[in-house]
């Protein structure tokens, strides 16, 4: 959410950003916000004047009564003031809500380095790591391979939960757990505090994290309750300190969340229709940082470096792309994706998303940091997030990149201590 005072002071920046995004439908909102805000402030003055008149007229009635003067008109005016005040307050509240509605849906201001593009086809590659390989033998579909080895059961999961769910069994269940602990151990080495968050959030908290109008259709809502299953641990970690004030000495605050993630809509994408890449439920280790504005851009690079370390130590080839204006969404000011090599498709696929949301979430959630020299001065923190590992996608990458001609799968060396020293699944 953009601060109202920012829109007042810099409407030209907001307009230029919307134009850069190609979101011209919202250009009219900027003028609407300014006009409704101006009118709401006028009404605030009017309410103050009416309340003052209510106090004054009480004295005038008392004085007129003592002087024996006619007080009929004064009494009539006094009787009408409460209703008039209520009417003006209602009008102001309507305007204030209309302003907030637009501010909640205006996108974040993009960093100047974000590339311009219409969709994900125009994201810009930044760098690559590792050598993508296409084996001489025909790779087996990761889902079919897992079923053949008794590592996964999709049919029985569909029978009890529907499509898009799965049982992980035996060695693959252990691999999922190993990936979680492996990524968490790396983050702990770098000073991140492990967090296991609530797996549900109420609507008020979720609206502070993201625009539910855009996001609600991919989430599971608890029937009859004002609760949602979380789509990522980023969301409860972002809302964790809502309506609180940090001391600057306590920032940056680095968190590492571990949770299942629940997504309703998964789509159908060719080779992904059966398997582990797009599913309704998966485990993820998520990085999250609260920071001062001065710290946040360096920390954005730190988050990306941490995710790269995870994939480098797993030996999985990847590339980093900078997300363009047409693909970045509402919340992030800048976003990178790490795309891991999938040899069966002979292309890179998204495995990590790394965002600097600047103050956008903090304004919605009212999370501030106090100026250490001016105790009463406060400003909004910046929030940043990045996947460390989403286990289902990493498992697919391992089953494809490390698949051998005999159908066995070589375990990355970094994971072997978590899998009893085994070299293959």
UniProtKB/Swiss-Prot annotation:
Pfam families: Seryl_tRNA_N, tRNA-synt_2b. It is found in: Cytoplasm. ATP binds at residues 263-265, 279, 350-353. Its EC number is 6.1.1.11. GO terms for biological process: selenocysteine biosynthetic process; seryl-tRNA aminoacylation. L-serine binds at residues 232-234, 286, 387. PANTHER family: SERYL-TRNA SYNTHETASE. This is Serine--tRNA ligase.
């Amino acid at each position: 959410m953009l601060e109202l005072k920012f829109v007042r002071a810099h409407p030209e920046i907001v307009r230029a950003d919307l134009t850069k995004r190609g979101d011209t439908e919202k250009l009219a909102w900027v003028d609407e916000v300014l006009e409704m805000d101006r009118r709401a402030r006028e009404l605030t003055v009017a309410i103050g004047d009416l309340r003052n008149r209510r106090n004054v007229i009480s004295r005038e009635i008392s004085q007129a009564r003592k002087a024996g003067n006619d007080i009929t008109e004064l009494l009539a005016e006094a009787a009408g003031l409460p209703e008039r005040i209520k009417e003006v307050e209602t009008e102001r509240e309507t305007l204030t809500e209309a302003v907030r509605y637009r501010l909640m849906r205006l996108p974040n201001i993009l960093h100047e380095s974000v590339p311009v593009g219409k969709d994900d086809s125009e994201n810009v590659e930044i760098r690559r790591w590792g050598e993508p390989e296409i084996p001489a033998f025909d790779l087996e579909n990761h889902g079919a391979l897992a079923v053949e080895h008794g590592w996964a059961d999709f049919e029985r999961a569909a029978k009890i939960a529907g499509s898009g769910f799965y049982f992980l069994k035996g060695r693959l269940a252990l691999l999922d757990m190993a990936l979680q602990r492996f990524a968490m151990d790396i983050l702990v080495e770098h000073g991140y505090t492990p967090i296991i968050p609530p797996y549900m959030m109420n609507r008020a908290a979720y609206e502070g994290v993201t625009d539910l109008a855009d996001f609600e259709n991919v989430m599971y809502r608890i029937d009859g309750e004002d609760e949602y299953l979380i789509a990522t641990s980023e969301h409860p970690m972002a809302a964790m300190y809502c309506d609180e004030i940090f001391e600057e000495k306590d920032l940056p605050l680095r968190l590492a969340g571990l949770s299942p993630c629940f997504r309703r809509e998964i789509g159908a994408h060719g080779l992904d229709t059966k398997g582990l890449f797009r599913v309704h439920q998966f485990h993820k280790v998520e990085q999250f940082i609260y920071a001062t504005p001065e710290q946040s851009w360096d920390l954005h690079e730190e988050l990306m470096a941490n995710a790269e370390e995870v994939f480098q130590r797993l030996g999985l080839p990847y590339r980093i792309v900078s997300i363009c204006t047409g693909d970045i969404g509402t919340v992030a000011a800048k976003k990178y994706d790490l795309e891991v090599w999938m040899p069966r498709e002979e292309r890179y696929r998204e495995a990590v998303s790394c965002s600097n949301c600047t103050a956008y979430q903090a304004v919605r959630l009212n999370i501030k940091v106090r100026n250490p020299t001016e105790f009463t001065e406060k400003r909004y923190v910046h929030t940043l997030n990045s996947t460390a590992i989403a286990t289902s996608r990493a498992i697919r990458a391992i089953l494809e990149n490390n698949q051998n001609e005999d159908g066995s799968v070589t375990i990355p060396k970094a994971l072997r201590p978590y899998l009893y020293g085994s070299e293959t699944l």
